[in-house]
Amino acid sequence: MNKAKVKLDKDLLKASSTMTDHQARFLVDTYYQMQNARIRSSAQVRGLEEEAEPSEVMTWVDEINLSLEENIKKALGKYALGHPIGKWSMGIKGIGPVISSGLLAYVDITKAPTVGHIWRFAGQDPTSVWNKGEKRPWNVNLKTLRW
């Protein structure tokens, strides 16, 4: 079966570099949602293949999910490359467009006088305690990026 493709056109890709941090946060979250959808659909396709029940529609859904995930990653790459810190961070081994964009979108460096403030905001401070009835002392989406 031919690979299904959803192509991100040049105008949308160009617009990705001018997204606001708020818009980038939504796109990072969407990337992780699409990744989960792709993982689920791939598992379903494998399960159907093991039972010798090929499903062209399910395979198509899996391919579309993969294509959407790849296009969102490209858009996030354009966003990250539109910022000097994004370019720098993508040059570090292990940090790609999604993590770089997530850090740019979630971390406001003007509100973090030290790296410890960023660690705490990302849920990395072992002394942080989340008691019942209190607001969570870290950003759950930023904490997801650290994985």
How would you label these PLM feature ranges?
Residues D29, N36, S67, P137, ...:
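Generic recognition of short, well-ordered alpha-helical interface segments
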Residues S42-V98:
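Helix-hairpin-helix/helix-loop-helix acidic hairpins
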Residues M1-G47:
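Phosphate- and other anionic-substrate recognition elements at nucleic-acid/protein interfaces
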Residues H22, F26-D29, W60, G91-I92, ...:
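Conserved aromatic-histidine-acidic binding/catalytic patches
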Residues W88-S89, G102-W147:
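Phosphate-backbone recognition surface of nucleic-acid-processing proteins
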